[in-house]
């Protein structure tokens, strides 16, 4: 996606399109219009057509889009044939939920290992994922693991991020309230569930439908 030089907003929507197109293919549907895509993914048709236009002629006017072609295109664009191996740091309630869920049911992302400091959890498996002590982080992380999920207390998030910066990790999904400072070669996505909930409540009160 980076080589295409497409807008980041478009890049964020590609997995959403891919998931819906997967479902269409499984249902046996052969083609789909931008209006149908719009209704399913809740993105307006003009935005979908603009997103798709960055990749050339993916469809035909009056015909729509060939589902199998779109599926093949997005699988290649999103590197769906390559497994992205992930480490999870912090096996509390949220971290444990991630381990039980994992991601291979829906895409090409797989949590390979987890880290914590709890004696009750270290040395066990949760959801089939081994849990190691945080002291073993640098030793256990292989070059194959390039993404980390942070579900640790906010007070230790920065120190863990600093340690991850010394490994081959290039992406961090941060579920802590802490805003992390890392080198430019590491990309961070912040997901603060409390902020998201507060934002939703604000919109409900101030922008009623």
From Swiss-Prot:
Would you kindly state one Gene Ontology biological process term found in this protein's UniProt entry?
response to redox state
**GO annotation, cellular component aspect:** cytoplasm
Q: Which SMART domains match?
A: CoA_binding
Q: Name one GO molecular function term.
A: DNA-binding transcription factor activity
Question: Which InterPro entries does the entry link to?
Answer: CoA-bd, NAD(P)-bd_dom_sf, Rex_DNA-bd_C_dom, Tscrpt_rep_Rex, WH-like_DNA-bd_sf, WH_DNA-bd_sf
Residues binding NAD(+) are 90-95
Sorted alphabetically, the keyword list is: Cytoplasm, DNA-binding, NAD, Repressor, Transcription, Transcription regulation
Similarity section: Belongs to the transcriptional regulatory Rex family.
Known role: Modulates transcription in response to changes in cellular NADH/NAD(+) redox state.
What protein name does the entry list?
Redox-sensing transcriptional repressor Rex
Native source species: Bacillus cereus (strain AH187)
């Amino acid at each position: 996606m980076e080589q295409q030089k497409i807008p980041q907003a478009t890049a964020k929507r590609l997995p959403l399109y891919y998931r819906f197109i997967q479902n269409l293919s499984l249902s046996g549907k052969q083609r789909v219009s931008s209006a149908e895509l719009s209704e399913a993914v809740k993105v307006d048709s003009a935005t979908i057509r603009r997103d798709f236009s960055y990749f050339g002629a993916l469809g035909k006017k009056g015909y729509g889009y060939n589902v199998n072609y779109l599926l093949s295109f997005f699988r290649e664009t999103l590197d769906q044939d390559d497994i992205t191996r992930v480490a999870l740091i912090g096996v509390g309630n949220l971290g444990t939920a991630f381990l039980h869920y994992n991601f291979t049911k829906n895409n090409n992302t797989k949590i390979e290992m987890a880290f914590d400091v709890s004696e009750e959890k270290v040395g066990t498996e949760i959801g089939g994922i081994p849990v190691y002590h945080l002291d073993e982080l640098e030793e256990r992380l292989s070059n194959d693991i390039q993404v980390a999920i942070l579900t640790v207390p906010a007070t230790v998030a920065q120190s863990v991020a600093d340690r991850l910066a010394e490994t081959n990790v290039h992406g961090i999904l941060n579920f802590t309230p802490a805003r992390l400072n890392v080198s430019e070669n590491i990309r961070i996505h912040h997901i603060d569930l409390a902020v998201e909930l507060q934002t939703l409540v604000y919109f409900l009160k101030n922008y009623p439908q």
